[in-house]
Design a protein with these regions (language model features):
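Helix-breaking motifs and short loop linkers at transmembrane-helix boundaries and internal kinks
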Residues: 27, 59, 80-86, 275-277
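Conserved MFS/SLC helix-loop-helix module at the cytosolic interface between two early adjacent transmembrane helices
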Residues: 46-82
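Helix-loop-helix hairpin linking two adjacent transmembrane segments in secondary transporters
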Residues: 115-169
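Paired small-residue
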Residues: 74, 85-93, 280-288
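C-terminal transmembrane helical hairpin of 12-TM major facilitator-type secondary transporters
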Residues: 256-299
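A late C-terminal transmembrane helix in Major Facilitator Superfamily
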Residues: 307-343, 349-350
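Cytoplasmic helix-loop-helix junction between adjacent transmembrane helices
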Residues: 90-128
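Helix-to-loop junctions at the C-terminal end of transmembrane segments
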Residues: 47-59, 242-254, 338
Length: 372
């Protein structure tokens, strides 16, 4: 399941580093190519809220296998696309797969592992998601240079086959426990603690993705680092390190992680603004950024299992929808700021969003210990 999370989220964000070859090959603008991320995000939001309601009568194992098939079909369609419409149709399918599977993943995990192993299992599962957030763009760049952009997207097909076989072997039959309706999802927000938690996680992802997509132009133009160095640095060090230590942040008391991670990212963003012209300092700060980014989905999913242990499908659906919304809005507002006010304003925007997330997370973080 962690591998599937990694493959899905990597597929969503690989276009970040492949905009130019995609646009040149399919004869449309880089702006249109960039819409692929927003388009898949839109369908992920829709599917996370409505998809599992439509599949409410199906065994959850069957639903996961279905979403894996959809991912593989998406890879084939995107790889063979010869125009804008076909390319975006493939991107819509990957959004459906992401929204559906990701919203179910934590609820499924809680049902198939021993209660004492839930925190560790979530760290492994969401570690795949978190690692993909960091390494997908440089991985796409590396694969694009090696086998072309079509080859890069086609890698999801053999990866999907591996996931499919493994799912059939290890995931037992999981009959649906209850229907997940929009009314049920919305009712979760009546809890002040849960609502504040959702606001905090939304701001955390908005802050992250108002800055992350624009690290490449920042590093190339301000710091003077080449793209190969960027790829190796992010892929080989920051993302992997952050994933490996994600379990460290999943403690009885989640407050330090829920507040400290976004606060740390805010400090890094601020320091990049001041020291971005110094390659050594920038490299060290990016390492810290990668380490602090990857545990965020792990910690928030663990928090959710403590706050709403009996409503994880509904909670997972809402969290995925909000994260996808945050990614889209963060990238959009960061891009607008980058284009019209310059990179400094983008980094300051990210800093403000991350600080707000840290402050709002205080109360939900305190309650998580009480619920434990």
């Amino acid at each position: 399941m962690a591998l599937l999370c990694f493959v899905l989220v990597s597929s969503e964000f690989m276009p970040v580093s492949l905009l130019t070859p995609i646009a040149n090959d399919l004869s449309f603008t880089e702006g249109q190519a960039g819409q692929a991320i927003a388009f898949s995000g839109l369908f992920a939001v829709i599917t996370s809220l409505f998809g599992n309601t439509l599949l409410a009568r199906f065994d959850r194992r069957t639903a996961v296998i279905f979403y894996t098939f959809v991912m593989m079909i998406s890879g084939v369609i995107v790889t063979s696309a010869h125009g804008y419409g076909m390319f975006m149709f493939g991107r819509a399918l990957i959004g459906i797969s992401i929204g559906g599977f990701w919203s179910l993943s934590t609820a499924i995990l809680v049902r198939i592992v021993h209660p004492l192993s839930v925190p560790k299992a979530i760290a492994i599962l969401q570690g795949g998601t978190a690692l993909a957030f960091v390494v997908a763009p440089p991985l796409g760049s590396f694969l694009g240079n090696l086998i072309g952009w079509r080859g890069a997207f086609f890698t999801v097909v053999p990866a999907g086959v591996i996931c499919l076989i493994w799912q059939m072997v290890v995931i037992p039959k999981l009959p649906p426990q209850r229907d997940t309706s929009i009314r049920q999802i919305a009712s979760l927000l009546r809890s002040r603690i849960f609502a504040l938690g959702m606001i905090a996680v939304t701001l955390a992802f908005m802050g992250q993705f108002s800055l992350s997509p624009y690290l490449r132009p920042f590093l190339e133009c301000v710091t003077g680092l080449g793209i190969n160095m960027i790829s190796l640095f992010l892929l080989g060090v920051a993302g992997l390190t952050g994933t490996l230590i994600s379990g460290f942040f999943v403690r009885d008391n989640l407050l330090p992680a829920l507040t400290g991670l976004p606060a740390g990212l805010a400090i890094v963003a601020g320091l990049l603004t001041a020291l971005g012209h110094i390659p050594a300092a920038t490299g060290a700060l990016l390492l810290v950024w990668g380490i602090l980014v990857t545990p965020i989905p792990v910690v928030w999913n663990t928090w959710m299992t403590r706050i709403i242990p009996d409503e994880l499908e509904a909670g997972g659906a809402l969290m995925v929808a909000l994260i996808q919304f945050a990614i889209t809005m963060g990238a959009f507002t960061g891009g607008e700021s980058f284009d019209h006010q310059g990179w400094v304003s983008t980094f300051m925007l990210a800093t403000a969003l991350l600080v707000a997330s840290a402050i709002i997370a205080v109360l939900p973080g305190r309650r998580s210990l009480a619920e434990k």
